[in-house]
């Protein structure tokens, strides 16, 4: 088996309905089977699903509603519960639990809420639960909507620390022209860097029941690739498409990231000006440098500056040596309260906890 990968799979309305007005259960069953197969092989799968409005419209018997935001939110409110129930039923066949996450732009733009969403998503994955993500269309206004699930899936891939993002659609990938009206159109296999010429190829096509077209998929690919995540646009009807993407077989159009997620994260941590500083004792210093450990509150001697949870801070030794930079799990006020204490005491001291470490090893770059 190849090393474990984290794959975000985005399923658009056109894939879930097969181009009809109702959810195509047989098609969804096959996609879940593929996901379950990769889950059993040790890979981590995240689903970003569209289809709430389509499910709501089907459940209500295709009512004639005015094309207003309120009507769309009504359909989403009715359909979301039906949609998540369908995913739950399908994955339960394979003994796999799912966890629903409904997000809005506000959840991803506010640092504290972003970190909470990230922690929830990664906790689901760590416990072998498949996250099923959708935008919270029933309450989202234009000001707080991500806008489409293509861009939402790119943000979910960043939250999950994904290796790859797979955008499944009713097309094989990105073509040199629209294949529906140009028989000479050729599939573009590999893309390294998205420019205006490529965006022009994407056009503004949108399926009848969805909100995304090829243009939004390019936006999503650009976001993900900038974060070090390879992105693939492929046909949801292609047999074994999910396994082929995991195995890095040629599928659809692959947008290659110019750097790995780790390299991207290192660049961000090194480049961010430290918002504060921690001085650690010799035991913590040894654990960080010699054993590659996380920084525990017990080893913190001094704290300087005022910083928020999720900001980059500097770690120094008692002798003043610049040891590392890392992302703080706690704000400066909380850090001052737990410094010098055992991790088991964090919850008792603060009344809450974001885990046993002050800075996790995965969020730390040694100088």
Curated annotation (Swiss-Prot):
Keywords: Amino-acid biosynthesis, ATP-binding, Cytoplasm, Kinase, Nucleotide-binding, Proline biosynthesis, Transferase
Membrane-spanning parts: none
SUPFAM superfamilies according to UniProt: Carbamate kinase-like (SSF53633), PUA domain-like (SSF88697)
Pathway(s) per entry: Amino-acid biosynthesis; L-proline biosynthesis; L-glutamate 5-semialdehyde from L-glutamate: step 1/2
Location in or out of the cell: Cytoplasm
Catalytic activity: L-glutamate + ATP = L-glutamyl 5-phosphate + ADP
GO cellular component: cytosol
Residue sites binding ATP per the record: 10, 169-170, 211-217
EC number: 2.7.2.11
Main location: cytoplasm
Gene Ontology process terms (BP): L-proline biosynthetic process
Pfam families: AA_kinase, PUA
Covalent S-S links between cysteines: none
Keyword Nucleotide-binding set for record: yes
Domain PUA: 275-353
Record PROSITE patterns: GLUTAMATE_5_KINASE, PUA
Molecular function GO labels: ATP binding; glutamate 5-kinase activity; RNA binding
Residues reported to bind substrate: 50, 137, 149
NCBIfam families reported in the protein's UniProt record: proB
Primary role: Catalyzes the transfer of a phosphate group to glutamate to form L-glutamate 5-phosphate.
HAMAP family: ProB
Matches recorded under PANTHER family: GLUTAMATE 5-KINASE (PTHR43654), ISOPENTENYL PHOSPHATE KINASE (PTHR43654:SF1)
Recorded family membership: Belongs to the glutamate 5-kinase family.
The protein's name: Glutamate 5-kinase
Organism: Erwinia tasmaniensis (strain DSM 17950 / CFBP 7177 / CIP 109463 / NCPPB 4357 / Et1/99)
Lineage of source species: Bacteria, Pseudomonadati, Pseudomonadota, Gammaproteobacteria, Enterobacterales
